[in-house]
Amino acid sequence: TATSRGTFELNGVSESELEPAIEAVQAAKLRLGGTGATVRAVVACKGTDCRKGMFDVHAFACRLDKEFYGIDVPKKFKIGVFGCLNSLGKAMAQDIGVMPSFTEPGKFEIYIGGLLGNRPVQGKHIPVPLKEEMVADAIRYVLDIYKTNGIYPQRLRTVLDDKKELWQEINYYFKSLAK
């Protein structure tokens, strides 16, 4: 089954077929994971190939995916990279959504704590435009806060709303990166 994050789920594999299925996946040079309390596959809009795309969305998303995919966290964690204002809603629906800055060309703005599902919540905009090379540091910092303060089954947004001082810590850290 294909998932909304561009991964596949193998359903109905019996225990006796599990090892050969894993070997087949590895032989095809595909990776295992994408479920449980981990950072999920980083999603991207079609921005690289879109006439409104403002940067190479796919290359940036791939770099972030290589660094963060599969990291253990208290509950699932979703990162998305989007290329223009048309994807603002998608950026706000991620644990971390990354978009180009519309006030400082060549920089990026981040939305944190978005949720979908039966209780959707818009991610909060962190109003500190960051250079591309600082975005991974910002994500790493947020993940560290989540891993340090969260416990299963809390999502990032719950952790941040329960300990409001963490929002301020994130803002201070982002400002230090932007200097």
Residue ranges and their predicted role:
Residues 1-103:
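Small-residue-enriched alpha-helical segments and adjacent helix-cap loops
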Residues 25-32, 68, 72, 139, ...:
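Structural signal for hydrophobic packing residues in well-ordered secondary-structure cores
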Residues 83, 87, 92-155, 169:
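Mobile "lid/hinge" segments at catalytic clefts and subdomain interfaces of large enzymes
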Residues 1-4, 35-36, 73-77, 148-162, ...:
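Flexible, glycine/charged-enriched surface loops at secondary-structure junctions
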Residues 42, 62, 74-76, 113-116, ...:
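A generic structural signal for ordered alpha-helices
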Residues 16-17, 165-169, 173-176:
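Terminal amphipathic helices with adjacent charged low-complexity linkers/tails
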Residues 13-14, 49-56, 127-134, 148, ...:
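Catalytic cores of large soluble enzymes that bind and process phosphate-bearing ligands
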Residues 58-63, 68-69, 75, 122-127, ...:
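Generic hydrophobic segment detector
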